[in-house]
Curated annotation (Swiss-Prot):
Chain ranges for the short sequence motif YXXM motif 1 as given in the UniProt record: 33-36
Record carries keyword Phosphoprotein: yes
Native species: Xenopus laevis
Gene coding for it: irs2-b
Motif range (YXXM motif 7): 666-669
Name of the protein this chain belongs to: Insulin receptor substrate 2-B
Residue ranges of the motif YXXM motif 6: 634-637
Length: 1077
């Protein structure tokens, strides 16, 4: 019988007969063979025992290897069994046995009877304490093929068995620890692997279970760094998943799920596993969370990142691990357990041994020297010169490289053409109470960081929600795309306080010490001016997008200016250059607390960023002056006088003007050619009169060399005749009807003014292609916006201005100019008020014949009127229009009144002069006068023989196309590349749009206020949409100032998508005809 290994039928019959006999000293070996679930050591020992029967060993010898014994219940049915835990000895390996009762155990010791079940501990994956709905104190053993659990009576008994089993399992494993955890693919799981927890789960065919055919009963084995799925009773390879690949996990009732990233062996997806009950599912969830949080202790692992949009997250940094002097394994080629998203890039030798580095967002516990990518895909690294820039006393926080070191990378959201990888990996990990998160994102190769949609902003937090990063280590100069360039690294070895004072700097010397490092550091701002060199002109770039349609934008980029580039044409991108005396002042010893003060300062060493561009030609002449603040310490947002205006709009900078820079370099939005436009007292009085100058299309350029190409703002008033106060006009200069007065300005003689002042277009051309429009920046309206805007275009062809500058429409329309207080009188109409001073001595008789005698070549002197609810009252008495405040009509009447002839009225008048219009009246009165001409002004040549062509009024249907705010007069041949600056962001609450045009008849009328009636009924929403005027005469004067050609000699006017007016005569030069795209 000793040599028989496989039992036959005869053997089975013999065994059956032997069972009927009383117990013998030699147990039946075949019966023992049948009871065992697998080949164990007891089988091997029983076979030779049949040859040489021996008496049973004494009880003391048999119980020497017993470590623990006692009654426990089986989990499934609750049957009580007697369990014996044996340690490794000469009798066999460590094992767990159980008998029906203690009596059989003792009898078996004497008679050699075998236990009912033997579980070798070296085959067990792990032992764990469990609890379910029925049993609160379970001790579970897991092997590859089965799960065996025992229920203890109380927690102390549970802990005793658990500790004993754990010790024996660890002793039996030896050196078989974590040998397979380095695998990231499918493989076999060797028996004896130590796991923290093992669960028997039923993987459902859902998500990855269906895609990867993973459904069925599995062992879910959790170790300290990985999780394994072992198919029960199958030879299918195990699935190994690193904990770092798990994005999140959770449970729902009796289901536990895991979501893994795309770097896992199974790919991205979810695994849904069914367990016994919700208690087990909750325990699994909590155990996974605790294990993943404890993963921080392993230095070779770092937090994973979330695969989400990079533009939705702010920047932060992880500051847990630090490499001082040595690079991480990802930089030296020893990348064994680094994550898949780590990018290995070449690092120059100069950047390998330094104590200053960039903190990367793609590292969690580890780090690397992350370079910043430029537009061309080049990499800029740290330099060892940065080491010497830090302060040694341990208070400095920011360290910057000198500007001539070439580390200012221009970054923008443009594709990288010749770089191997177009993405830069970032790592983020987070966790909450119900799930862990660890995903992956790839950041576009853009270093623009302030949250623009196209830029690669990202977030990085500590592993599993430990702590977010700290933004204070990353100071961004502005949110322009080209502002990142050189981000200050972290000074690792300095002892810094974790808490900073949030109060304002009280010492004038309290500049950041990194200003001492780069003596001429300049802060970046939005580019508000253009370079003088026409070849190097570029469009302004905002943080939102880049103008990809412009070749100049794609070819030229503004770089951080070094001291060698002070005469460059790109200097206008910098504001508040800390130069000369400011740089000298910053060399003083100062204490740096690392925070930027949030309160304004009265000296130029405050950390506020002035918003004024500086002179391109002589940057050294500009010194930053103290900021204008009030008694409460708030920054005054008024424009300054003198030099900024002159420098911005092209004037020569004088010494007196530079010394008057009193507002810290804020942009003066007022008229740009007069030095004495605004007095300092206007700032003290909180004058709001200067708020009327807002951003207008940059295409309104000057015709003469005196105008500056830097100016991107165009005042709509007369360039040489700034609206002023004087006894001759008697009009208070105010915009909001308040007491804020603008100081008087000098008015030069008309002859010298036309030659010296900047010539601006008097007509706003519509629909010019290629035009750039800068949106309005501010709106200082007195009250809230009414229900519908009055969209004014107020053009005054006058040689003498008689009213103050008027702000843009208070209703928020960038296409309107005029008084914000008077707009509210009639919020339902969209006016275009053209006030023309006729300056031809022979105009009186000519105006009687035809309205077409009006020359389209008007004077370039433009002033903003203050419209009111009444028309301008002409002193000649022939074209006086009475008030219409007390009546509202849906129609307007245009009356053609001559200066020396009785008025021709389309509507009757009452005794007191009040208009009596009827709905049948379609045109409003057009008052035409005459003034003496001055230096090529508005000319009215000889009358024409043909009959008068009155104004043609086109009336639109109420359901038809409403008039656009930019569809106004387009008097076609004023030079300059005008653009349709009134085509965007206009609110049109009413289409009752009337074009009200009149000509003054006496030069004394400039002493009176020019007002216009804007009364319109709300009953008719289909107002005047177009008005066509034929305004050419027989002889066009070629010497008219408005007839100059473009700088390139061309008079071609580009046409937009709106209607322009064709002013032609058979015997006159033909202006550009109206076309409609």
């Amino acid at each position: 019988m000793a040599g028989v290994l496989c039992p036959t039928e005869e053997d089975r019959s013999i065994r059956a007969a032997v069972r009927m006999l009383p117990p013998q000293p030699c147990p039946d070996e075949s019966g023992g063979y049948r009871r065992m679930s697998g080949p164990t050591l007891s089988q091997v020992q029983e076979e030779p025992a049949a040859e040489t029967p021996q008496p049973p060993a004494p009880a003391s010898t048999a119980e020497d290897d017993v470590r623990k014994r006692g009654y426990l219940r089986k989990q499934k049915h609750g049957h009580k069994r007697y369990f014996v835990l044996r340690s490794q000895s000469h009798l066999g390996p460590a094992r767990l046995e159980y008998y029906d009762n203690e009596k059989k155990f003792r009898s078996g010791q004497r008679s050699g009877c075998h236990p009912k079940r033997v579980i070798p501990l070296y085959l067990c994956f792990t032992v764990s304490r469990r609890a379910d709905a029925k049993n609160k104190h379970l001790v579970a053993l897991y092997t590859k093929d089965e799960y065996f659990a025992m229920a203890a009576e109380n927690e102390q008994e549970q802990d005793g068995w658990y500790q004993a089993l754990s010790e024996l399992i660890n002793e039996s494993k030896g050196a078989c620890l974590d040998t397979e955890e380095l695998e990231e693919n499918y493989g076999t799981l060797r028996p004896g692997t130590v796991f923290k927890e093992v669960w028997q789960v039923n993987v459902k065919p859902r998500g990855l279970g269906q895609a990867k055919n993973l459904s069925g009963v599995y062992r879910l084995c959790l170790s300290s760094k990985a999780v394994h799925l072992v198919k029960l009773n199958s030879d299918v390879a195990c699935v190994h998943l690193l904990l770092m690949n798990i994005r999140r996990c959770g449970h729902s009732e009796n289901y536990f799920f895991i979501e893994v990233g795309r770097s896992s062996s199974t790919g991205a997806g979810e695994l849904w596993m069914q367990v016994d009950d919700c208690v087990v599912a909750q325990h699994m969830h909590e155990t996974f969370l605790d294990t993943m949080k404890a993963l921080k202790a392993y230095s070779e692992f770092r937090p994973r990142s979330k695969s989400q949009s990079s533009g939705t997250n702010p920047i932060s940094f992880i500051t847990t691990r630090r490499y001082l002097g040595n690079l991480p394994p990802s930089q030296t080629g020893l990348q064994q357990r680094r994550a898949r998203t780590e990018t290995v890039v070449g690092t120059p030798p100069s950047a390998k041994n330094n104590s200053f580095r960039f903190r990367t967002s793609s590292e969690g516990e580890g780090t690397m020297t992350r370079p910043f990518r430029s537009v061309t895909g080049s990499l800029s690294h740290l330099n060892t010169a940065r080491i010497n820039l830090g302060k040694q006393e341990g208070v400095g926080r920011y360290v910057r490289a000198p500007f001539n070191s070439g580390y200012h990378s221009r970054s923008a959201s443009l594709p990288v053409s010749h770089f191997p990888s177009a993405t830069s990996p970032i790592s983020v990990c987070s966790s909450n109470g119900h799930g862990s998160a660890s995903e992956t994102l790839t950041r576009p190769s853009s270093s623009s960081v302030c949250g623009s949609p196209s830029d690669g902003g990202f977030i990085s937090s500590d592993e599993y929600g430990s702590s977010p990063g700290d933004l204070r280590y990353f100071r961004v100069r502005s949110n322009t795309p080209d502002s990142l360039g050189n981000t200050p690294p972290i000074q690792e070895e300095n002892t810094l306080s974790d808490y900073m004072s949030m109060s304002a700097h009280s010492q004038p010397d309290s500049r950041d010490d990194y200003m001492e490092a780069d003596k001429c550091f300049r802060k970046r701002t939005y580019s508000l001016t253009k370079p003088t060199n026409a070849a190097s002109q570029q469009k302004s770039q905002t943080a939102v997008s880049l103008d990809e349609d412009s070749e100049e934008t794609n070819k030229q980029f503004a770089y951080a200016e070094s001291p060698k580039l002070k005469d460059s044409s790109h200097v206008e991108d910098y504001s508040n250059g800390v130069i000369d005396s400011v740089c000298n002042h910053s060399r003083r010893k100062a204490s740096d607390d690392g925070y930027m003060p949030m309160m304004p300062s009265n000296s130029y060493d405050s950390d506020y960023l002035p918003m004024a561009p500086k002179s391109v030609s002589a940057p050294k002449q500009i010194n930053s002056c103290p900021s204008q603040v009030d008694s409460k310490g708030y920054m005054m947002m008024f424009p300054v006088n003198g030099s900024p205006v002159k420098n911005v709009f092209g004037g020569a900078a004088t010494k007196s003007n530079i010394e008057k820079l009193s507002n810290g370099g804020y942009m003066d939005m007022s008229y740009g050619n007069s030095i004495k436009q605004v007095h300092d007292s206007s700032l003290n009085n909180n004058s709001r009169g200067l708020s009327s100058y807002f951003s207008l299309p940059r295409s309104f350029k000057s015709l003469t060399k005196q105008t500056s190409d830097h100016s991107e703002y165009v005042p709509m008033s007369s360039p040489g005749k700034l609206l002023h106060l004087g006894a001759e006009n008697g009009v208070d200069a105010c915009t909001n009807g308040a007491d804020h007065n603008v100081a008087k300005t000098e008015l030069k003689s008309p002859s010298s003014t036309l030659d010296q002042q900047v010539k601006r277009p008097t007509k706003l051309m519509l629909g010019i292609r290629g035009s750039n429009t800068i949106p309005r920046m501010f709106d200082h309206s007195a009250s809230a916006e009414p229900t519908s805007p009055g969209e004014y275009i107020n053009i005054d062809f006058s040689d003498k201005a008689s009213s103050t500058p008027c702000s843009l429409s208070a209703e928020g329309s960038p296409s309107s100019l005029g008084s914000s207080c008077d707009h509210r009188h009639s919020p339902l109409s969209d006016y275009m008020s053209v006030d023309i001073d006729v300056q031809s001595p022979k105009a009186t008789a000519d105006l009687c014949d035809s309205l077409t005698d009006i020359s389209p070549y008007a004077c370039t002197v433009v002033s903003r009127m203050q419209p009111n609810a009444e028309y301008a009252k002409l002193p000649c008495g022939t074209a006086c229009v009475s008030k219409t405040d007390n009546r509202i009509d849906d129609y307007t009447t245009m009356t053609f009144n001559m200066a020396m002839t009785p008025p021709r009225s389309f509507a009757g008048e009452t005794e007191n002069g009040t208009k009596v219009d009827s709905p049948s009246s379609i045109v409003n009165r057009l008052c035409i006068g005459d003034l003496t001409s001055l230096n090529g002004g508005f000319s009215l040549p000889n009358p024409l023989p043909e009959p008068m062509a009155g104004p043609k009024v086109i009336r639109a249907d109420s359901q038809g196309r409403r008039r656009h705010s930019s569809e106004t007069f387009s008097s076609a041949s004023t030079v300059t590349t005008s653009s349709s600056c009134f085509t965007e962001s206009s609110k049109r609450h009413s289409s009752a749009s009337f074009d009200n045009v009149w000509l003054k008849s006496d030069e004394n009328c400039c002493e009176q206020e020019n007002k216009m009636s804007r009364n319109c009924s709300t009953g008719f929403q289909n107002g005047l949409n177009y008005i066509a005027l034929s305004m050419h005469d027989g002889v066009c004067e070629p010497t008219s100032p408005a007839c100059h050609q473009h700088q390139n000699g061309s008079r071609i006017l580009e046409n937009g998508g709106y209607v322009s007016i064709d002013f032609t005569r058979s015997d006159c030069l033909k202006c550009p005809s109206s076309r409609k795209d």
